[in-house]
Amino acid sequence: MSQHVDIAAELDFALHLADLADAHTLSPFYRRDFSVDWKENKTEVTELDRATERLLADEIMRHREPHAIFGEEFGSAGASSAPLTWIIDPIDGTSNYTRGIPVWATLIALVNANDEPLVAVVSAPALHSRWWAGRGMGAFNARGKIQVSNVRALDEAQVSVTHHAAWDQVGGTQKLVELQQRAYRSRGFGDFWQHMLVAEGNIDAAVDAIGLEPYDTAAVCLVVREAGGTFTDRLGAASFRNGSAVTSNGHLHSDVLNIIRC
């Protein structure tokens, strides 16, 4: 269905949404002007998460009424049969946000009925950074078009790994350790940022947590792919809905998956 969508126009609209989100989230972050609650899954949420998602949803309904919405805080809105769905994470990295760490972003993606991401924006105003992509248009940041690295050997690669208890539960922790030992250098940049660093060619592969949701992955998936990289789940499937995310420059993807697969 993507041939019936004006991708450039929808990308412009997604960038407009990101502008709204940045204006809503950045000042309270610096002022530390928000309260923190806890969800049932023991993750933090602020009133800014909820208010930002509501702001973006209202703007989408105002200007893209036929489209559906799926967001972290309020779930689905609009017709389930809608040909296009906006997938939103108002603040990816809420834990960082609440602690004054500037590594957080608003993630916005538009996907079609075949679950193909068409446009994506990852906006991290506290990092003074934004990344965006349109299907078939490439991926960009403020400096221009971005592209993944050309590193082809794992022992020359910089990787980022996000570990938590779910990796223990599937017996994968030692595999992550092995990946880090075999890489030239390992860091833990976390959340969206590690994948954007892959897209920019600054690092060469990133392995995320297990238990991710589509609002964590839809936008980063398209940005990485349009930058020439590869996005899969931890088992190698291409869907962004499978609860995990591995990104790379493509050359290293099989090597990474062969080590961490469990």
Residue ranges and their predicted role:
Residues 14, 18-21, 120, 220, ...:
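Small-residue (primarily alanine) positions within well-ordered alpha-helices
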Residues 141-145:
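A structural micro-motif at secondary-structure boundaries
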Residues 25-28, 49, 60, 94, ...:
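Residue-level signal for inorganic ion chemistry
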Residues 72, 123, 209:
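Conserved residues at the C-terminal ends of beta-strands
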Residues 1-91, 252:
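N-terminal subdomain of lithium-sensitive/metallo-dependent phosphomonoesterases centered on the IMPase/IPPase/PAP
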Residues 147-262:
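An extended, acidic
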